[in-house]
């Protein structure tokens, strides 16, 4: 019984992401560039028609500017609105697209089960509907898995990827996380902020039990991406996890290595002569939920990656 209460508490706490996203998390020091900027406001909102389904989207900045946009993918039980802490820092540097995944937010319930392949198809469909030929992709949790699947299946549509607390294989999660997800029911969330937020946003507020069931089934299914397929992803990858994340650190490290991390030549010479193919960041004292309070830090780490900024060598070390 105590174990079930602990699982329920973990999930209900995740609901606070949606509530806190609109006002930022307390106790987090924001960078000067983000502090000086106002909370990003979408330049356009609407619905994208994708194969008979309608997906709510938000865009920031000018998609026709010629600069590759960043597609932001939210996690389970969340919405594009809940990703505001991450969007803020990126929207001052590039166009940003966010949308509500099937069953979530203002998109609402759609027929059929959830699969990561379908979610990747949906994301590409939104890009096509917005006439965006390709985008860099940042995904958190469920969105991180979707970003990996997108990069494997649609190499021409996906530029760089920022995988935040996401995996390429189901066993990348700790077993306890998978066990917890297998036990969720609509009753787990009864009266929780998460359920209330869903009903506030959704055009199908009565479908919350269906959302819970579809997410539970999606997380129980096999969505593993073969190591060879991950290694073959064309563009660069950054992996960001917390040191107390639901993602196993061994998996994050393996994903980093598969994507070209661990440059032994650079290790031997002591510096990176050019921007690497893969980057790995492990945030200290940070959990799977807590990483959403690190929006400014995530953008500060990710923007140089997206811009292919060459790592700095301190003066006095090279001729």
Predicted regions and their residues:
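Conserved HGGG/HGGXW glycine-rich cap/lid loop of the alpha/beta-hydrolase fold
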Residues: 53-106
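Conserved loop-alpha-helix segment in the C-terminal half of the alpha/beta-hydrolase fold
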Residues: 243-286, 294
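Alpha/beta-hydrolase fold catalytic core
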Residues: 2-3, 8-12, 17-68, 93, ...
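Catalytic active-site module of serine/aspartate enzymes centered on a nucleophile-bearing elbow/loop
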Residues: 272-319
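Flexible "cap/lid" loop of the alpha/beta hydrolase fold
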Residues: 145-153, 159-195
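Short beta-strand/loop motif that positions the catalytic acidic residue
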Residues: 233, 239-241
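Active-site nucleophile elbow and catalytic-triad environment of alpha/beta-hydrolase enzymes
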Residues: 213-229
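Active-site loop/oxyanion-hole signature of alpha/beta-hydrolase fold enzymes
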Residues: 98-138
């Amino acid at each position: 019984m105590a174990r079930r209460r602990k699982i329920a508490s973990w999930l209900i706490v995740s609901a606070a992401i949606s509530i806190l996203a609109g006002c930022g998390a307390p106790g987090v020091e924001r960078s000067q560039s983000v502090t000086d900027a106002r909370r990003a406001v979408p330049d356009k909102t609407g619905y994208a028609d994708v194969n008979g389904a309608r997906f709510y989207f938000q865009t920031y900045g000018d998609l026709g500017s010629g600069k590759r946009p960043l597609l932001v993918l939210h996690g389970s039980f969340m919405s594009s609105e809940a990703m505001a802490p991450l969007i803020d820092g990126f929207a001052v540097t590039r166009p940003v697209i966010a949308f509500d995944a099937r069953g979530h937010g203002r998109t609402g319930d759609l027929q059929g089960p959830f699969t990561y392949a379908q979610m990747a198809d949906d994301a590409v469909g939104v890009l096509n509907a917005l006439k965006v030929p390709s985008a860099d992709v940042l995904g958190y949790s469920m969105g991180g898995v979707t970003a990996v699947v997108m990069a494997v299946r649609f190499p021409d549509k996906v530029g760089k990827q920022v995988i935040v607390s996401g995996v390429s294989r189901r066993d990348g999660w700790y077993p306890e996380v998978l066990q917890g997800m297998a036990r969720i029911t609509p009753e787990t969330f009864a009266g929780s902020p998460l359920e209330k937020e869903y009903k506030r946003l959704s055009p199908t507020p009565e479908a919350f039990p269906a959302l819970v069931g579809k997410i539970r089934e999606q997380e129980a299914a096999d969505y593993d991406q073969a190591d060879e397929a991950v290694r073959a992803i064309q563009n660069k990858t950054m992996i960001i996890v917390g040191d107390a994340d639901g993602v196993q650190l061994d998996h994050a490290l393996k994903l980093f290595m598969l994507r070209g991390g661990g440059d032994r030549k650079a290790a031997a010479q002591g510096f990176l002569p050019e921007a690497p193919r893969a980057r790995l960041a492990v945030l200290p004292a940070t959990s799977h939920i807590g990483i959403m309070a690190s929006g400014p830090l995530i953008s500060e780490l990710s923007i140089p990656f997206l811009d292919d900024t060459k790592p700095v060598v301190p003066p006095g070390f090279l001729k």
